[in-house]
């Protein structure tokens, strides 16, 4: 059995910086045509010059790959700065509630504050797409749900602003997407295939720790259903986020799952298992092209076949290991060729 996926798109990707970027970027830039690049670096991408500098670093270390750059939402994003960004081809804003995830200490503390709403108004005028890490302070399994009132306010106040709920993790968010025309979402491999049991049902597995948390069986099944039918308001976004094993095995474990090396084979395996391979093309590419109005992307054909693929346990960067999701396991699909 074989399948060819055309122009795969990752609508949510972390490729880090410097040596780590060089170590992990190829896992995404080779099989994917494009990816929405997250701006929460150690020095966040708060303006156009910094963002373009980072884009150049990505382009220098890849080929036939389009990084879709995003700005880190902040009060300094004036109308003039947003116009400057748009003129340079930047079309995404990423809003992080303060302290909710990695490098979100510079995030937005008042989500409905006057300055936040002013930036959103200007973003709507200029046709930006708003990507939201949709969590608010509260019980860990309810953080996404607790953000619903903010998302509804955004959707109603800015009806022409396209809003993406990043890495959807709570089944209760599905109704929100179906209620508002301008609300969309991305789904990760881990949220549609894993539950809290994978994280802490046996021994604690730090390599399955992410934000938002993988949740209950009900959440996983409902989200998987969206993916399997390639719901038109949903696109694939891996949220692949590498960390060194030395940090993952520390007393202060960073959130993030490095899934990039297995994405296409694992998705083929999952969709085939549920007799939905015919919908994978829409989930992995077609929906994103429509939602984000993407064109003139690098052409890619990812050829996969149903042959065993033993997942490496890790990759290396500066003699440090980075654990790969499902490392040591054998997947039933293998990425054979990229053309």
Curated annotation (Swiss-Prot):
Zn(2+) 2 binds at residues 94, 133, 167. The active site is at 239. One of its GO terms (molecular function) is zinc ion binding. The modification N6-carboxylysine is found at residue 94. Pathway: Pyrimidine metabolism; UMP biosynthesis via de novo pathway; (S)-dihydroorotate from bicarbonate: step 3/3. One of its GO terms (cellular component) is cytosol. It is an enzyme of class 3 (hydrolase). It comes from the Bacteria. Its EC number is 3.5.2.3. Keywords: Hydrolase, Metal-binding, Pyrimidine biosynthesis, Zinc. Its cofactor is Zn(2+). The keyword Zinc applies. GO terms for biological process: 'de novo' pyrimidine nucleobase biosynthetic process; 'de novo' UMP biosynthetic process. Binds 2 Zn(2+) ions per subunit. Zn(2+) 1 binds at residues 12, 14, 94, 239. Substrate binds at residues 14-16, 40, 133, 243, 255. It catalyses: (S)-dihydroorotate + H2O = N-carbamoyl-L-aspartate + H(+). InterPro entries: DHOdimr, Dihydroorotase_CS, Metal_Hydrolase. HAMAP family: PyrC_classII (MF_00219). Catalyzes the reversible cyclization of carbamoyl aspartate to dihydroorotate. PANTHER family: DIHYDROOROTASE. Homodimer. Belongs to the metallo-dependent hydrolases superfamily. DHOase family. Class II DHOase subfamily. This is Dihydroorotase. It comes from Helicobacter pylori (strain J99 / ATCC 700824) (Campylobacter pylori J99). The lineage of its organism: Bacteria, Pseudomonadati, Campylobacterota, Epsilonproteobacteria, Campylobacterales. The gene is pyrC.
